[in-house]
Amino acid sequence: MFLRHVIVFSLIALLTGCAGLTSREAVQGKGDPAQWREHKQQLSSLDGWQINGKVGIRAPKDSGSGTLFWLQRQDYYDIRLSGPLGRGAARLTGRPGAVVLEVANQGRYEATSPESLLQDQLGWKLPVSHLVWWVRGLPAPDSKSNVTLDGDSRLASLEQDGWQVEYLSYVEQNGYWLPERVKLHGQDLDVTLVIKDWQPRKLGQ
């Protein structure tokens, strides 16, 4: 049970590098589309961050929560999980083409992508590479999306690839408005992310 939690928590919180902003989206809601485009452009320039927070997951036969540390440096990531997940901790590191998951007292698992690691270990298919975009409050650029804007021209909700993402609150950090509380709803799976500390970076300059 602990290993199942660890793999899901690790892969729900990640990353396969940052690309250009070319999402195909339908926009509705209260916000101004022009301000939304400016907001997207600003956030898309972030290619590094450090996050501290909490993550929870609920499935028909499985649920749990834990603390999250996520370091992103362009296409490299280091994600660590601990807390009330079980009797250990986990660390997920890698870059495109090479992913390593280390679980205390459980073992070491390798794959070429976070999606394939999740598929191999649990038999689940999740668009985990979208999270590098969703965590910044952006739709992933490689598939169609339906976007609803709030009154500040930021994401209120997002529908993409069978997932519904709700943005419950934002926080301002270093001039960037970034998600603070996010809920993700998929088929038979709900994920809640609460970010306690955002440290955004622009590394590619």
From Swiss-Prot:
Keywords, comma-separated and alphabetical: Cell outer membrane, Chaperone, Lipoprotein, Membrane, Palmitate, Protein transport, Signal, Transport
Entry keyword Lipid metabolism: no
Subcellular location: Cell outer membrane
Superkingdom as given in the UniProt entry: Bacteria
Lipid-substituted positions (S-diacylglycerol cysteine): 18
Role played: Plays a critical role in the incorporation of lipoproteins in the outer membrane after they are released by the LolA protein.
Name of the featured protein: Outer-membrane lipoprotein LolB
Source organism of the structure: Pseudomonas syringae pv. syringae (strain B728a)
